[in-house]
C-alpha cells in the first residue's frame, strides 16, 4: 500500500486505494480529529473489498462519536467485534495490512 499522504490537508495522514492482482481493493483513510469527538485523536476507516465489492474486512471507529467515548470496530465478513486501538493510525493500519495479507493469501 502506498500510504499516500493526504495532499494539502495536514490533518489527513493516509488516503489511498489500491487494486490487488485478483481485482480486490484496499481503501484506507485516516486523519487527525478533535480529541473531544474521538478520544484517540484520530478518525479512520480501512476497508478490504473483494473483486465484486463484497466487504471482506473493515476497521473503523464509527461514523459518529459515542456518548461514552470511542469504539474501535473490526468487521470480518459477517462478523463484528470491538478491538483495541493500536495507539496511532499508522500502527493500526499495519495491523490491518497484516490481516489483509493473510486473507488475500487464503483466498488466492
Tell where the protein language model's regions lie, with residue ranges.
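The feature represents the first ordered module of a protein
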Residues: 2-71
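Single, function-defining residue in the core of a domain
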Residues: 74
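Well-ordered alpha/beta subsegment
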Residues: 78-108
Amino acid at each position: 500500500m502506498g500510504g499516500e499522504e493526504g495532499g494539502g490537508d495536514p490533518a489527513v495522514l493516509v488516503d489511498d486505494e489500491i487494486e490487488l492482482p485478483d481485482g480486490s481493493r484496499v481503501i484506507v483513510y485516516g486523519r487527525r480529529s478533535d480529541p473531544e469527538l474521538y478520544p484517540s485523536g484520530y478518525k479512520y476507516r480501512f476497508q478490504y473489498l473483494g473483486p465484486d465489492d463484497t466487504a471482506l474486512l473493515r476497521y473503523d471507529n464509527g461514523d459518529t462519536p459515542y456518548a461514552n467515548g470511542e469504539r474501535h470496530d473490526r468487521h470480518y465478513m459477517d462478523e463484528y467485534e470491538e478491538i483495541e486501538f493500536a495507539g496511532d493510525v499508522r500502527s493500526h493500519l499495519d495491523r490491518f495490512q497484516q490481516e489483509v495479507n493473510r486473507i488475500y493469501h487464503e483466498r488466492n
